[in-house]
Design a protein with these regions (language model features):
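N-terminal loops that bind phosphate or other acidic moieties
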Residues: 1-163
Length: 163
């Protein structure tokens, strides 16, 4: 479903279906893409469910958006209009520019086992800006492959994953 709030509904629909239905419990687009990449056309449904579900366990997902109100959370004092970086349910970075916030958030997400960073840039980000950010991240983390994709999402400057 790519939304943690929809997983339960999808599972209930599966239970009511008269034909076999499988739910991969993805909670965001980055997990959904990782699961889709793990799909093997030659494998059985059960094997695919296992592989796709396992793939989402290796994905860390972050988002960069604009704060809609003043708040204090996770040790950050955030003001309406600040650009914030989220990792899981926590604010992990705050700043004035989306690219600055992505780089700060990635510091909390990338470790020695990380090999790929995927940036999905939103409708308020130009392809040139996204490619520039990807190049900066590549320079910071030369052992990690960095890719930028047009996600077109309206509310997040960036959705990004680390695998």
């Amino acid at each position: 479903p790519n939304n943690k709030n929809i997983v339960l509904s999808a599972e209930q629909a599966r239970d009511l279906a008269e034909k076999p239905v499988f739910v991969i419990p993805t909670s965001n687009v980055a997990e959904g893409i990782a699961a889709a990449v793990a799909f093997m056309p030659e494998a059985s449904a059960e094997e695919n469910v296992e592989a796709m579900t396992a793939s989402i366990e290796n994905v860390k997902c972050g988002q960069v958006t604009t704060a809609v109100r003043n708040t204090r959370m996770d040790g950050f004092s955030v003001h309406e209009g600040d650009v914030i970086g989220l990792f899981g349910k926590k604010i992990v970075a705050r700043g004035k520019s989306p690219s600055e916030v992505v780089k700060h958030a990635l510091k909390k997400m990338i470790d020695e086992e990380s090999s790929v960073v995927s940036l999905y840039f939103g409708s308020d980000v130009t392809e040139d800006d996204a490619n520039k950010l990807a190049a900066e991240i590549q320079e910071l983390y030369p052992d990690v492959e960095v890719m930028a994709f047009n996600g077109g999402q309206p509310y997040y400057y960036y959705v990004f994953s680390v695998e």
